[in-house]
Design a protein with these regions (language model features):
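Conserved, structured core segments of small domains
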Residues: 1-116
Length: 116
């Protein structure tokens, strides 16, 4: 089964990390991605630019409305994702627990919808 691990964190919490802590987090994250890839469970991953670069698009009555920023006002914002292959939800949750960003934020795990 395929699962997406959505990585959320508070921007202030991340910006308060020291350069050494940021470097360690980057190193740990890349190493974990490589570990998942070696085990055949990694599909894709990406970190996202800050929320200030976000644009929101809605189409109503056939007309697009584009606004700056995210749709909702929340403390934690989407920072990235890891798309994985797991045997079941329990394995996906175990994988999510190992994501280094889980130490600084929240990982939301959702199964892919199979239109099959």
């Amino acid at each position: 089964m395929k699962f997406i691990c959505l990585v959320y964190a508070e921007p202030d919490a991340l910006s308060s990390l020291s350069p050494a802590e940021k470097s360690e987090l980057d190193r740990d994250s890349l190493a974990y991605d490589q570990e998942l890839e070696a085990s055949g469970r990694f599909i894709a991953a990406s970190a996202l630019q800050g929320v200030k670069t976000a644009r929101t698009v809605r189409v109503r009555a056939g007309k697009p409305l584009v606004t700056d920023g995210p749709f909702a006002e929340t403390k934690e914002v989407l920072c990235g994702f890891i798309f994985i292959e797991a045997a079941d939800a329990d394995e996906a949750l175990n994988i999510a627990q190992g994501i280094p960003m889980a130490r600084h934020g929240t990982i939301e795990v959702r199964p892919e919808l199979d239109f099959g």
